[in-house]
């Protein structure tokens, strides 16, 4: 039996948020893998929204398999909606075949006596599902559950809420499905196979987009020092603070000129705040000085916060908004003609109340309102400069307006971004901290990457707004440079040119790009292509330059070495490809026999051995693996680690790959031989593609000092 466990999806009210794409993906994955049941451990909504609840329940019911659902604390945030939400909660005891799932409703950190009574009847085939870790429940309830746990250590207890995953004994913390909040790794769902008694994760994979690096930049709190850093690291996007105008004009101009000469493309200047007091807008002298400085620098972009005026003030007197936008429009006309203006969202502070006395611009619709009002009066383009930290550190509004909601509602208007991490420190939540991991504790950038790849977010400058004058942004730049330098590759994929493939090359390539693949080889079957070889080769060759700014595209071909599928007398028909993959070499009927190297030399191009245990091949033919692999390396032959796990292959894994990853001696032999190892997902359906497995294998090879086959194709 296969059971799917999920938690912490946090569906918001906006159905265009990326969380709904995760739900669609999860349901599709559950169907493809023929799961027997689905169990959801709470927080299916962000704040108990009725419409989000209905959408979730409809999707789960449409699976047509047993489902167990419990609420989490987020589902109970809107008091008036709690009765509606809880009508969909499963009973305490749920039978799934010969297994039992005890559904513990601990959404308010308490557990009913009825539930404790059910817990006393558990056996080896029982799963206990709850939302919170039991140690975090209210005092006496936690003590009572811990006592029960001591008596039943063999029962599996699964929970969510932490947004991070771990397994200790039979306690299982489930990874969040929400790409806004999944900690430490990508959002995922978790399957449990009752036959093997193993958990396996399926990831909603959100890698760093291949094309984001040219948009990355820094906010300069120490302009001279920071611009020197930009020169050294090829940073093409720069934001200066308004205080930069205090630097000698000739000095700052020379620095900007040098930066542009070195490839700088987008210079932004952050504006002073806009105030309204005593019937007057802003500081006229300050603003005029800012506009003059922006024009002098020939800025490509300026950013400004929403007006520092209360919601109540603007609602009571609409003329104030008119005065503010008139004030700004009059000055923005003096900016360079192509200069873009980005309106930035703000956030709740300890001084604010969550009512109309707070500052305007804490929620998406207010930012959009101001942007559109200003845009109607300006000749310059007006958009949104979306600050992710401000959107996240915005309680209580962050519960309703999740990051995914901000992206869905304002993404099409964005002209830039401020990215940073929010950290919970001794003084409370702190913004503008370095991003030291992509999937952080308070902000996971998985949803940002997913939105970027899906076109929900416009491609625009991504500024790391890390405050400090001593290069506090450097760890963040280093983190992204590490990912930029990863040359993740996949040399085994199929299109509709193969009989077993289904998708057009364009769709296959787009899938690889969205999965963060840098070098991608399409390698359709020789026998499937048939007499269309020139058509196939021409098509892939024509597509390569079209996608060259996002991915390096190779055209390979996969050869079955069975005599009925390949004519060994015409090897020249393979010469024009970038490489070939060879399969069936262990088959006694095959054309290779014990002379793989000679066979490969006929094609006069790089050859790789696909989905084959080369140690077994050496054993079969009496070769010393180290010597044979060394000889293969001399001929630029490579060996594939096939990481396929898809519907075409029945979701089975190659044993030789798992064995290699666990066998240090085999790794040593390959490492010493200098043999290049390739990674191939062997994809036949785009919806099956699992980029996480490709990245995982690439990282494994690099971490173990094993040569990778991408090196054979990088000039």
What do the PLM-derived regions correspond to, one by one?
Residues 62, 68, 138-200, 661-665, ...:
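Conserved beta-sheet core of the metallophosphoesterase superfamily
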Residues 1-55, 485-515:
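N-terminal active-site segment of His-dependent metallophosphoesterases
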Residues 381-383, 419-425, 479-491, 495, ...:
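Charged catalytic cores and adjacent phosphate/nucleic-acid-binding surfaces used
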Residues 289-304, 312-331, 354-374, 526-641, ...:
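Extended substrate/RNA-proximal surfaces in nucleic-acid metabolism proteins
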Residues 26-37, 100, 110-170:
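His/acidic metal-ligating clusters that form di-metal
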Residues 17, 21, 164-210, 462-464, ...:
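Binuclear metal-dependent phosphoesterase catalytic core
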Residues 207-213, 224-231, 291-300, 311-316, ...:
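Histidine-acidic metal/acid-base catalytic patches
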Residues 13, 30, 210-221, 226-250, ...:
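An N-terminally biased module of ancient metal coordination in phosphate/nucleic-acid-related enzymes
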